[in-house]
């Protein structure tokens, strides 16, 4: 499997450090966007971008252009694109579309890291959370993609925090062992 098709996990070796991260939920009709705070602790919804239909080859689609604009507005250091896999972990048509979207976005913003992150059932869990909070089905359509993007990004932020904390603890243990 190509590296661009695998979901990634936070890695201290490639981590861009402090700064905002964006989470992207690529749907067939809409794209949900979420952002973190600069310390990478909390994900919040940003907006829902309409998915572009057919775009002439060689041109930047309006959805990619808008996401790139949001990346610049938020001065994002990293973009996490949800990679929807089947429950068996296989790549379906939605995953293929998310990978293609990530590649097109990568061409527009080459200086910003684009990561793919497993997002199985994020839309389902987002819909359940919205329903449980009293949002009616009709109102969900406007925010479901943002809620899924928040879920994707928050999962990444939580995992990143754990990875960075464990690296810090390992370095601390190593340096305190040097004193003995």
Curated annotation (Swiss-Prot):
E.C. number(s) listed in UniProt: 3.1.-.-
Pfam families: RuvX
Entry coiled-coil feature ranges: none
Domain of life: Bacteria
Intracellular or extracellular location(s): Cytoplasm
NCBIfam families: RNAse_H_YqgF
InterPro entries: RNaseH-like_sf, YqgF, YqgF/RNaseH-like_dom, YqgF/RNaseH-like_dom_sf
Chain residue ranges for the region called Disordered: 1-23
Keywords on record: Cytoplasm, Hydrolase, Nuclease, Ribosome biogenesis
Organism: Nocardia farcinica (strain IFM 10152)
Primary localisation category: cytoplasm
Enzyme class, spelled out: hydrolase
Name this polypeptide is given: Putative pre-16S rRNA nuclease
Statement: the UniProt record of this protein carries the keyword Hydrolase: yes
Function: Could be a nuclease involved in processing of the 5'-end of pre-16S rRNA.
GO terms for MF: nuclease activity
A cellular component term, taken from the record's GO annotations: cytosol
């Amino acid at each position: 499997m190509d590296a661009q098709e695998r979901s990634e996990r936070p890695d201290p070796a490639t981590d861009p450090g402090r700064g905002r991260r964006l989470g992207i939920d690529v749907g067939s009709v809409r794209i949900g966007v979420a952002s973190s705070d600069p310390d990478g602790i909390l994900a919040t919804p940003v907006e829902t971008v309409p998915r572009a239909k057919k775009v002439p080859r060689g041109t930047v689609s309006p959805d990619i252009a808008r996401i790139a604009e949001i990346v610049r507005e938020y001065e994002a250091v990293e973009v996490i694109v949800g990679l929807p896999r089947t429950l068996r972990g296989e790549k379906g048509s939605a995953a293929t579309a998310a990978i293609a979207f990530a590649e097109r976005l990568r061409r527009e913003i080459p200086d910003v890291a684009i990561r793919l992150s497993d997002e199985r059932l994020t839309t389902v869990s987002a819909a359940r959370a919205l329903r449980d909070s009293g949002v009616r089905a009709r109102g969900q359509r406007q925010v479901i993609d943002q809620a899924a993007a928040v879920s994707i990004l928050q999962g990444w932020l939580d995992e990143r925090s754990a990875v960075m904390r464990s690296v810090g603890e390992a370095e601390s243990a190593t340096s305190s062992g040097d004193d003995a």
